[in-house]
Amino acid sequence: MKLPQAFYARDTRTVARALLGKVLVHLDGGVRRAARIVETEAYHGPDDRASHARAGPTPRAAIMFGPPGRAYVYLIYGTSHCMNVVTGPEGFPSAVLLRAAEPIDGCLHSTRGPGNLCRALAIRREHDNGRDLAGDDLFVEDAPPPSEAVVTGPRVNVGYAGAWAARPWRFALRGSPWVSRPPPGAAAARAARAPAAPAPRPRRPRGSGP
Protein backbone atom coordinates (compact mmCIF):
# COMPACT_ATOMS: atom_id res chain seq x y z
CA MET A 1 0.00 0.00 0.00
CA LYS A 2 1.27 3.47 -0.88
CA LEU A 3 1.88 5.89 1.94
CA PRO A 4 -0.88 8.55 1.97
CA GLN A 5 -0.30 12.29 2.01
CA ALA A 6 -1.15 12.36 5.72
CA PHE A 7 2.01 10.33 6.40
CA TYR A 8 4.14 13.19 5.08
CA ALA A 9 2.09 16.01 6.64
CA ARG A 10 3.98 15.79 9.95
CA ASP A 11 7.13 17.16 11.52
CA THR A 12 10.07 16.50 9.22
CA ARG A 13 12.09 14.72 11.88
CA THR A 14 9.19 12.39 12.63
CA VAL A 15 8.82 11.54 8.95
CA ALA A 16 12.57 11.03 8.49
CA ARG A 17 12.57 8.38 11.20
CA ALA A 18 9.28 6.83 10.07
CA LEU A 19 10.52 6.38 6.48
CA LEU A 20 13.18 3.90 7.60
CA GLY A 21 12.17 0.44 6.46
CA LYS A 22 9.65 1.73 3.92
CA VAL A 23 10.10 0.85 0.24
CA LEU A 24 10.81 3.46 -2.43
CA VAL A 25 9.37 2.36 -5.79
CA HIS A 26 9.86 3.76 -9.29
CA LEU A 27 7.97 2.18 -12.18
CA ASP A 28 10.39 3.04 -14.95
CA GLY A 29 8.93 2.26 -18.36
CA GLY A 30 7.09 -0.72 -16.92
CA VAL A 31 10.11 -1.95 -14.94
CA ARG A 32 9.72 -1.99 -11.17
CA ARG A 33 12.77 -0.58 -9.40
CA ALA A 34 12.52 -0.73 -5.62
CA ALA A 35 14.70 -0.36 -2.53
CA ARG A 36 14.15 -0.40 1.24
CA ILE A 37 15.04 2.95 2.83
CA VAL A 38 17.81 2.64 5.44
CA GLU A 39 19.10 6.21 5.83
CA THR A 40 17.46 9.66 5.78
CA GLU A 41 18.15 13.28 6.72
CA ALA A 42 15.65 15.90 7.90
CA TYR A 43 15.74 19.52 6.68
CA HIS A 44 13.38 21.51 8.85
CA GLY A 45 12.01 24.94 8.08
CA PRO A 46 13.32 28.26 6.75
CA ASP A 47 15.70 28.80 9.68
CA ASP A 48 17.63 25.58 9.04
CA ARG A 49 20.92 26.90 7.64
CA ALA A 50 21.62 23.55 5.99
CA SER A 51 18.38 23.67 3.99
CA HIS A 52 17.81 25.03 0.49
CA ALA A 53 14.78 26.80 1.98
CA ARG A 54 17.01 29.22 3.90
CA ALA A 55 17.07 31.45 0.79
CA GLY A 56 13.28 31.48 0.44
CA PRO A 57 11.12 30.00 -2.32
CA THR A 58 13.72 30.17 -5.09
CA PRO A 59 12.98 28.40 -8.39
CA ARG A 60 15.03 25.46 -7.12
CA ALA A 61 13.49 25.17 -3.65
CA ALA A 62 9.92 26.31 -4.33
CA ILE A 63 8.64 22.72 -4.13
CA MET A 64 9.66 22.60 -0.46
CA PHE A 65 7.07 25.32 0.25
CA GLY A 66 4.28 23.34 -1.41
CA PRO A 67 2.04 20.52 -0.23
CA PRO A 68 3.55 17.51 1.51
CA GLY A 69 4.02 14.21 -0.26
CA ARG A 70 5.81 15.60 -3.33
CA ALA A 71 9.21 14.57 -4.67
CA TYR A 72 11.91 17.22 -4.55
CA VAL A 73 14.67 16.11 -6.93
CA TYR A 74 17.71 18.26 -7.64
CA LEU A 75 21.14 17.93 -9.19
CA ILE A 76 24.45 18.17 -7.31
CA TYR A 77 27.94 18.48 -8.78
CA GLY A 78 26.26 18.64 -12.19
CA THR A 79 26.05 14.86 -12.34
CA SER A 80 24.11 13.33 -9.45
CA HIS A 81 20.42 13.56 -8.61
CA CYS A 82 19.15 13.59 -5.03
CA MET A 83 15.58 12.77 -4.03
CA ASN A 84 13.74 14.31 -1.09
CA VAL A 85 10.14 14.02 0.04
CA VAL A 86 8.37 17.24 1.03
CA THR A 87 6.92 17.13 4.55
CA GLY A 88 5.01 19.17 7.11
CA PRO A 89 2.25 21.69 6.51
CA GLU A 90 2.14 23.53 3.20
CA GLY A 91 4.04 26.81 3.42
CA PHE A 92 6.53 25.56 6.03
CA PRO A 93 9.47 24.42 3.88
CA SER A 94 10.69 21.03 5.01
CA ALA A 95 11.88 17.86 3.33
CA VAL A 96 13.55 14.53 4.00
CA LEU A 97 16.57 13.53 1.93
CA LEU A 98 16.67 9.83 1.05
CA ARG A 99 20.35 9.03 1.60
CA ALA A 100 20.56 5.26 1.15
CA ALA A 101 18.50 2.12 0.66
CA GLU A 102 18.76 -1.65 0.45
CA PRO A 103 18.14 -2.90 -3.12
CA ILE A 104 15.08 -5.09 -3.70
CA ASP A 105 14.04 -5.05 -7.38
CA GLY A 106 15.53 -3.81 -10.64
CA CYS A 107 18.26 -1.60 -9.21
CA LEU A 108 20.74 -0.44 -11.83
CA HIS A 109 23.52 0.64 -9.47
CA SER A 110 24.63 0.67 -5.86
CA THR A 111 21.99 2.26 -3.63
CA ARG A 112 24.45 3.52 -1.00
CA GLY A 113 24.41 7.34 -1.03
CA PRO A 114 21.75 9.74 -2.39
CA GLY A 115 23.23 10.09 -5.88
CA ASN A 116 23.67 6.35 -6.24
CA LEU A 117 20.14 5.72 -5.02
CA CYS A 118 18.63 7.95 -7.70
CA ARG A 119 20.86 6.39 -10.34
CA ALA A 120 19.87 2.88 -9.26
CA LEU A 121 16.15 3.64 -9.46
CA ALA A 122 16.43 5.85 -12.58
CA ILE A 123 15.05 8.89 -10.74
CA ARG A 124 15.80 12.14 -12.58
CA ARG A 125 15.03 15.79 -11.94
CA GLU A 126 13.61 16.44 -15.39
CA HIS A 127 11.02 13.65 -15.03
CA ASP A 128 10.38 13.32 -11.31
CA ASN A 129 10.82 16.70 -9.59
CA GLY A 130 7.48 17.77 -8.10
CA ARG A 131 5.86 14.40 -8.70
CA ASP A 132 2.97 13.50 -6.38
CA LEU A 133 4.08 10.47 -4.37
CA ALA A 134 0.48 9.26 -4.30
CA GLY A 135 0.71 8.75 -8.06
CA ASP A 136 1.32 5.63 -10.09
CA ASP A 137 4.99 5.88 -11.10
CA LEU A 138 6.98 7.10 -8.10
CA PHE A 139 5.84 6.35 -4.55
CA VAL A 140 6.76 4.89 -1.17
CA GLU A 141 5.16 1.63 -0.08
CA ASP A 142 4.28 0.94 3.52
CA ALA A 143 6.16 -1.84 5.31
CA PRO A 144 6.30 -3.22 8.86
CA PRO A 145 8.40 -1.25 11.35
CA PRO A 146 12.07 -2.22 11.01
CA SER A 147 13.51 -4.72 13.46
CA GLU A 148 16.81 -2.84 13.49
CA ALA A 149 17.46 -0.08 16.00
CA VAL A 150 17.59 3.50 14.71
CA VAL A 151 20.78 5.50 15.20
CA THR A 152 21.08 9.26 14.74
CA GLY A 153 23.86 11.69 14.02
CA PRO A 154 24.70 14.98 12.30
CA ARG A 155 23.89 15.44 8.64
CA VAL A 156 26.59 14.91 6.01
CA ASN A 157 28.52 17.68 4.18
CA VAL A 158 26.72 20.63 5.81
CA GLY A 159 29.65 22.18 7.66
CA TYR A 160 28.71 25.58 6.20
CA ALA A 161 25.54 25.58 8.36
CA GLY A 162 27.28 26.51 11.62
CA ALA A 163 25.52 25.22 14.71
CA TRP A 164 22.83 23.67 12.52
CA ALA A 165 25.40 21.21 11.18
CA ALA A 166 25.53 19.48 14.57
CA ARG A 167 21.80 18.79 14.80
CA PRO A 168 21.28 14.99 15.02
CA TRP A 169 18.89 14.91 12.11
CA ARG A 170 20.36 11.99 10.20
CA PHE A 171 18.60 8.68 10.84
CA ALA A 172 19.85 5.22 9.89
CA LEU A 173 19.17 1.56 10.58
CA ARG A 174 21.92 0.24 12.81
CA GLY A 175 24.05 -2.45 11.21
CA SER A 176 22.76 -1.98 7.65
CA PRO A 177 25.61 -2.44 5.15
CA TRP A 178 23.82 -0.05 2.80
CA VAL A 179 24.09 3.05 5.01
CA SER A 180 26.25 5.61 3.20
CA ARG A 181 28.19 6.62 6.29
CA PRO A 182 27.56 5.19 9.77
CA PRO A 183 26.57 7.97 12.20
CA PRO A 184 29.09 8.77 14.94
CA GLY A 185 28.65 6.42 17.85
CA ALA A 186 27.43 3.50 15.73
CA ALA A 187 30.88 1.91 15.76
CA ALA A 188 31.20 2.53 19.48
CA ALA A 189 27.79 0.96 20.04
CA ARG A 190 28.85 -2.12 18.08
CA ALA A 191 32.03 -2.35 20.12
CA ALA A 192 30.05 -2.04 23.35
CA ARG A 193 27.84 -4.97 22.32
CA ALA A 194 30.82 -7.17 21.42
CA PRO A 195 31.81 -9.78 24.01
CA ALA A 196 34.72 -8.76 26.18
CA ALA A 197 38.02 -10.47 25.53
CA PRO A 198 39.01 -12.94 28.26
CA ALA A 199 41.53 -11.63 30.77
CA PRO A 200 45.03 -13.06 30.31
CA ARG A 201 45.97 -15.80 32.74
CA PRO A 202 48.61 -14.70 35.23
CA ARG A 203 52.00 -16.25 34.72
CA ARG A 204 53.04 -18.71 37.37
CA PRO A 205 56.40 -17.92 39.00
CA ARG A 206 59.17 -20.32 38.08
CA GLY A 207 59.73 -23.08 40.55
CA SER A 208 56.32 -22.81 42.12
CA GLY A 209 54.30 -25.94 42.66
CA PRO A 210 51.21 -27.06 40.83
Curated annotation (Swiss-Prot):
Gene3D superfamilies: Methylpurine-DNA glycosylase (MPG) (3.10.300.10)
Keywords: DNA damage, DNA repair, Hydrolase
Biased composition annotated in UniProt, kind: Low complexity: 186-196
Region (Disordered): 180-210
Keyword Hydrolase: yes
Top-level enzyme category: hydrolase
Superkingdom in the source lineage: Bacteria
EC number: 3.2.2.-
GO molecular function terms listed in the Swiss-Prot or TrEMBL record: alkylbase DNA N-glycosylase activity; DNA binding
Gene Ontology process terms (BP): base-excision repair
Residue ranges with Basic residues bias: 201-210
UniProt record similarity statement: Belongs to the DNA glycosylase MPG family.
NCBIfam families, sorted: 3mg
Protein name, as recorded: Putative 3-methyladenine DNA glycosylase
Organism: Anaeromyxobacter dehalogenans (strain 2CP-1 / ATCC BAA-258)
